[in-house]
Amino acid sequence: MELATREKVNEVLFMNRGEGESSYAQNSSFTQQVASMAQPALENAVETLFSKDFHLQALNAADLGCAAGPNTFAVISTIKRMMEKKCRELNCQTLELQVYLNDLFGNDFNTLFKGLSSEVIGNKCEEVPCYVMGVPGSFHGRLFPRNSLHLVYSSYSVHWLTQAPKGLTSREGLALNKGKIYISKTSPPVVREAYLSQFHEDFTMFLNYRSQEMVPNGCMVLILRGRQCFDPSDMQSCFTWELLALAIAELVSQGLIDEDKLDTFNIPSYFASLEEVKDIVERDGSFTIDHIEGFDLDSVEMQENDKWVRGEKFTKVVRAFSEPIISSQFGHEIMDKLYDKFTHIVVSDLEAKLPKTTSIILVLSKIVG
């Protein structure tokens, strides 16, 4: 199955469900580290809203691509805590928080809402009562009424594309990115161009719909997987998909996966540079950039001395976010073998140390008028 349409991607793009060993809920520690690095930006965004003369009675906030797990709860707690702090400082009365949790229809909303406790949202008698609603659907379309959101947050979601890039087969129907699932050193220039073009189209669409939904001067905090280097085929940018492609190729060589399935599969994700992100925002013209920065974190927990333990932990993280979309192409029955092979490749690469993972923090304000 080629991920050539939005409909197909929307069906299979979600994190591993439940609370089992391979679930996203149990393997989201890396994205938790990323979110903690961006927490000051979120706190500052909430504080900024109180200085923009909104005359707030209720703050409407949305977490787009929320998945299911502790990271979502931390976002709610941070917003609520900052609102309570500002209310005490400004002596606000009857201020409420409405949080909308959004993701695609395949997301595990049951696990998400089962995890919501009074510790996260508090009770309705507190100084800032919190109300939480689920909003299933694609954030590449309209989700909310016009001028209704004060704050938009999204972590590690916007780098996912609506579909595999267009134009990755020749006129004769031959795969142009043969043996790979993402941009690599062996990919022809057309592959890089197609990925950037698809990201430009999708991110522009994302900004356009958010500009319709957000109030003037509303704040948006985005965290996305990105890259520091200029070259998108640099291993620092693409190593996860490169190693996964090697694991798939190993199973192809063993006759366990059809080679054509590998050649026709391209992951619908793009790790943009800061310059590319900034350029798209400026071209769109709906938002001002209040802050943009990139930072690197270790891809594997370096505190653990045993390289096999480190490799297995990294595999669980990758499996949690990649298995649904990978299994849709190569079959559920082969997944244990595939990720076992991936672990072996990761462990061998640990000898040379895996590259760090780059994330981008982007803080935007909607332009008035």
Curated annotation (Swiss-Prot):
Keyword set includes Isomerase: no
EC annotation from Swiss-Prot or TrEMBL: 2.1.1.160
Residues annotated as binding S-adenosyl-L-homocysteine: 24, 66, 71, 103-104, 138-139
Keywords: Alkaloid metabolism, Magnesium, Metal-binding, Methyltransferase, S-adenosyl-L-methionine, Transferase
InterPro entries in alphabetical order: MeTrfase_7, MeTrfase_capping, SAM-dependent_MTases_sf
Keyword S-adenosyl-L-methionine listed: yes
Gene3D superfamilies documented for this protein: Methyltransferase, alpha-helical capping domain (1.10.1200.270), Vaccinia Virus protein VP39 (3.40.50.150)
Pathway connected to this protein: Alkaloid biosynthesis
UniProt remark on cofactor binding: Binds 1 Mg(2+) ion per subunit.
Reactions performed catalytically: 1,7-dimethylxanthine + S-adenosyl-L-methionine = caffeine + S-adenosyl-L-homocysteine + H(+); theobromine + S-adenosyl-L-methionine = caffeine + S-adenosyl-L-homocysteine + H(+); 7-methylxanthine + S-adenosyl-L-methionine = theobromine + S-adenosyl-L-homocysteine + H(+)
The family this protein is said to belong to: Belongs to the methyltransferase superfamily. Type-7 methyltransferase family.
Further remarks about this protein from its record: Caffeine is catabolized to produce theacrine in Camellia sinensis var. assamica cv. Kucha, but not in cv. Puer.
Record-given protein name: 3,7-dimethylxanthine N-methyltransferase TCS1
Origin species: Camellia sinensis var. assamica (Assam tea)
Gene name per UniProt: CS
